[in-house]
A protein has these predicted regions:
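Residues on the lipid-exposed face of transmembrane beta-strands in outer-membrane beta-barrel proteins
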Residues: 1, 33-39, 52-56, 82-90, ...
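Short glycine/proline- and aromatic-enriched beta-strand/turn motifs that initiate or cap beta-hairpins
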Residues: 1, 139-192
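Glycine- and aromatic-enriched membrane insertion/assembly motifs of diderm outer-membrane
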Residues: 1-22, 33, 42, 178-208
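Residues that define the transmembrane beta-barrel architecture of outer-membrane proteins
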Residues: 6, 25-31, 76-82, 118-124, ...
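Transmembrane beta-strands of outer-membrane beta-barrel proteins
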Residues: 8-12, 48-54, 98-102, 124-126, ...
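Transmembrane beta-strands of outer-membrane beta-barrel pores
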Residues: 14-20, 54-62, 104-108, 132, ...
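Repeated loop/turn-to-beta-strand initiation elements of outer-membrane beta-barrel proteins
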Residues: 90-98, 134-138, 199-203
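Outer-membrane beta-barrel "beta-signal"
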Residues: 120-141
Length: 208
């Protein structure tokens, strides 16, 4: 499992943000799903990893012409939250690790309301991890290297996704751009036959 999928992990998380302008945009709180795994093992105690987060964020102060007219970024109280992390993990002991890397974050309402410039951040990541359930020690990694991985049976699988949302648009006039007063629904689907090449790679085409 560790050799095939890079010790993948999933869970739920809670994040709090402050941009130093709480009066204009608020102090958002994000609730999200996350998944991460090892991309490459540099040596027995050092690895390069990724983690993505996807969820919703609240606590925003949407644009109001009278109270926060400088807020040209956020038009909704609830916004989508997307985050990607790339980091190094140093194993200090079988259970304790030090992490350091970069993190990219995007907040947006998907054009469901205006304004929708969104908020994008780039930052550093520094943390300490403690694993309550890890029983292996670092030397067991060498023993795992001799474990035989079963050959992958290549096959075809199918992905089908149906989605729906709503959207608002603006129109250009001589005085400038003005938002339309109403939103409209958007629906769609995609169907993708996928050829499973190995344990971690699938290739295919999609009909949207």
């Amino acid at each position: 499992y560790d050799r095939i999928y890079g010790n993948v992990y999933q869970g739920i998380g809670l994040g709090c943000y402050s941009f130093g302008e709480s009066r204009q945009i608020g102090n958002p709180v994000a609730f999200y799903l996350f998944q991460g795994a090892r991309i490459a093992r540099i040596c027995p105690w050092l690895s390069f990893n990724y983690e993505w987060n996807f969820g919703l964020s609240g606590g925003w102060k949407p644009y109001d012409e009278q109270y926060n007219s400088y807020n040209k970024m956020v038009g909704s109280k609830i916004n989508a939250y997307l985050n990607a992390n790339f980091y190094l993990r140093w194993a200090l002991s079988p259970r304790l690790s030090l992490t350091s890397g970069v993190t990219l974050t995007h907040f947006s309402n998907g054009n469901t309301n205006f304004p929708n410039a969104g908020v994008n951040t780039l930052g550093g990541k520094l943390g300490v991890e403690y694993n309550f359930y890890r029983k292996e020690d670092l030397t067991s990694l060498h023993a795992a290297a001799s474990y035989h991985i079963p050959p992958f049976q290549r096959h075809v699988s199918y992905d089908f996704v149906f989605f729906g949302s709503w959207r608002r648009k603006g129109i250009w006039m001589q005085e400038g751009q003005y938002p339309l007063p109403e939103s409209y629904p958007v629906f769609g689907f995609n169907f993708a036959p996928m050829y499973n090449v190995d344990y971690k790679l699938r290739l295919g085409v999609s009909l949207d």
